[in-house]
Amino acid sequence: MFSRIFNYVLLLIAVAFALSGAVATLAQKGKQHPSFEVLTHRMDVDVDGAPNAYGPPGTQTLDILLNAHYLNRADNEIVGYLIDEQKRPIPQGPKDPFPGYYISQTAFTDIENQNQRDPRKYVDARNINYVVRGNAARRRGVRVGDFASVFSKRTRMGVFAIVGDTGNPTGDEGSLHLLRDLGYPFLDGKTDSVDQPEIVIRFYPNSNPKHQFFFTQSELNEAAMKLGLSRDFSSAPIAYR
């Protein structure tokens, strides 16, 4: 009789632990990071950060030199690659990925890499999904390096990304890898673009306070999922899906 009671008590304890664990799990899943969504007017391809983005005339690059200027105007400052005090392009060294090409930069950088002239310090547009922070996102507290989810209303695909660059007040730009990951067959930043308002960005303000840097998209995806972020847009407002 005593053994039955003892076993029954053990069973109750086990059930209680199981229920408490389930409740804790549900509570954790219920904690969603604050976010908001923006429908872009268009989306141009940004190749900044790629080591072969810009180079001397005659080299095979992902973009034209004009696009390295702010707002793509020749009379504006150069923001797409590093220049010296005489405003001359700083070339990559012999041990860099593309020797002789210009060092293309992004606003988000690897803070553990103190070498400003190392192309690896910047977000490679060929390998990482990133969006450009526009004025609207900045006013709502989005920081460079924060996570985002991006959805194409045309291809019906959703992916994780980070806020990797600035420089376009509209925010209507995304990395080459981002557009390709969304299903667009783009090759470079010279002429490729999404001309319709069909790309939706979900921003997660202050979601990367430690400025974690990523060298592969799989690392970025893993970090986003650990935070409980979502690339599912099925429950978004009708205008965003």
Q: Where in the sequence are the language-model features?
A:
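Bacterial N-terminal signal peptides
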Residues: 10-18
